[in-house]
From Swiss-Prot:
Organism per entry: Rattus norvegicus (Rat)
Keyword terms of this UniProt record: Lipid transport, Membrane, Mitochondrion, Receptor, Transmembrane, Transmembrane helix, Transport
PTM text: The N-terminus is blocked.
UniProt name for this protein: Translocator protein
Protein family: Belongs to the TspO/BZRP family.
Gene this protein is translated from: Tspo
Gene3D superfamilies: TspO/MBR protein (1.20.1260.100)
Length: 169
């Protein structure tokens, strides 16, 4: 019996694994600290973040499956589009420990700018292989722009809080 669904499900779920690991930092003391910060009025309610990230992670994960399948697996030809994807995913997963764990809002902002750049490069690389896979990243790019602005305003408005006024430690 062929289990051709396994790569589709596996690659779709991979981004969420890092999201679950990052959730470790977004609880307890990290949440209390974040709740104490000044945030802009357009800050989304906390309950919306899990569904948003779940949807974005699933879309990017399925997009990676499309690229993987189109290029015949983890081939030399897949190195750039899947390598960029892996790089942006690692940078994405690094954000919660930087922001909530280390409370380094400035460095978290730098991380988000890097994620945005590498995610844009990923989208362009994917578009050459599969425009539908690239389109699955469009909502993610929009969310990254929003998240970057939110991170900036939180950093700016909380200067002097732990990690709020400095980029270097």
């Amino acid at each position: 019996m062929s289990q051709s669904w396994v790569p589709a499900v596996g690659l779709t779920l991979v981004p969420s694994l890092g999201g679950f690991m990052g959730a470790y930092f977004v609880r307890g003391e990290g949440l209390r600290w974040y709740a104490s910060l000044q945030k802009p009025s357009w800050h989304p309610p906390r309950w919306t973040l899990a569904p948003i990230w779940g949807t974005l992670y699933s879309a990017m994960g399925y997009g990676s499956y499309i690229i993987w399948k189109e290029l015949g697996g983890f081939t030399e030809e897949a190195m750039v589009p899947l390598g960029l994807y892996t790089g942006q995913l690692a940078l994405n997963w690094a954000w919660p420990p930087i922001f909530f764990g280390a409370r380094q809002m400035g460095w978290a902002l730098v991380d988000l700018m890097l994620v945005s750049g590498v995610a844009t490069a990923t989208t362009l690389a994917w578009h050459r292989v599969s425009p539908p896979a690239a389109r699955l990243l469009y909502p993610y790019l929009a969310w990254l722009a929003f998240a970057t602005m939110l991170n900036y305003y939180v950093w700016r408005d909380n200067s002097g809080r732990r990690g709020g006024s400095r980029l270097t430690e």
